[in-house]
Amino acid sequence: MKLLISNDDGISALGIRTLANALAEAGHDVTVVCPDRERSATGHGLTLHQPIRAEIVESIFHPAIKAWACDGTPSDCVKLALWALLESPPDLVLSGINQGANLGTEILYSGTVSAAMEGMIEGIPSIAFSLTSHISRNFQPAAKFATILVEQLAAKPIPDLMLLNVNIPPVEWEEIAGVKLTRQGVRRYVDVFDKRTDPRGKTYYWLTGEVLEEVEPPEGLNLPQNVPIDVHVVRNNYISITPLQYNLTYATGIDKLSDWDFPLS
């Protein structure tokens, strides 16, 4: 398959090297276009008021891989690849492997998921891969599963246009309990701003935070209750696959507001 791979951790990240090399070694036609530096939690931002530069990168990846480092956001990278760098569209857009989970409401901030979402917006099935640890350096099990999943999709394509958000627990391959189709949960954070003063007396802030609670999504979303939540299955060493789409229309909200009047005066 022809694959485009991006990420938000940057061109030097171990996760994207492990993923891209594994897929190239499996015989796929792999192109990498990703940020030239760390761009985590940039969401779906695009660069509009300055030029975007992309440089060919050699010696980082498998010799069969063509790679570019881009000074834009993750979404910039995918958009640039699809419209300017690639000679023909890929069969799949992949993003990752991210260093850290993208579960629940975290996906709204995620550059990893947004890069994959950009592929889906352009009509290409896409997958975001995340290793649910900020410290583990063992991306091999995640890359192994990614290779298996891509091979499966080559034989049996995704039946509808969607993004698969895949989170892999940070354990050895033999310790993975299985794979489960999941629905998106809710992760609430307590955000703390660390206030500091620079040598010139100017105030600045560092945003820190930790998970406060993991809760069920609202019932009004009409999601099947028999489908487990992503944050729960990963905790039990299952791989989580959550199908996503970009249409954020709240169908229940339309129903609840259908009898409202919205006067202009």
Swiss-Prot record:
GO terms for molecular function: 3'-nucleotidase activity; 5'-nucleotidase activity; exopolyphosphatase activity; metal ion binding; nucleotide binding. Binds 1 divalent metal cation per subunit. InterPro entries: SurE, SurE-like_Pase/nucleotidase, SurE-like_sf. It is found in: Cytoplasm. The keyword Transferase does not apply. GO terms for cellular component: cytoplasm. The lineage of its organism: Bacteria, Bacillati, Cyanobacteriota, Cyanophyceae, Nostocales. Belongs to the SurE nucleotidase family. It comes from the Bacteria. Its cofactor is a divalent metal cation. Coiled coil: none annotated. Nucleotidase that shows phosphatase activity on nucleoside 5'-monophosphates. PANTHER family: 5'-NUCLEOTIDASE SURE (PTHR30457), 5'_3'-NUCLEOTIDASE SURE (PTHR30457:SF12). It catalyses: a ribonucleoside 5'-phosphate + H2O = a ribonucleoside + phosphate. This is 5'-nucleotidase SurE. A divalent metal cation binds at residues 8-9, 40, 98. It is an enzyme of class 3 (hydrolase). Its EC number is 3.1.3.5. Keywords: Cytoplasm, Hydrolase, Metal-binding, Nucleotide-binding.
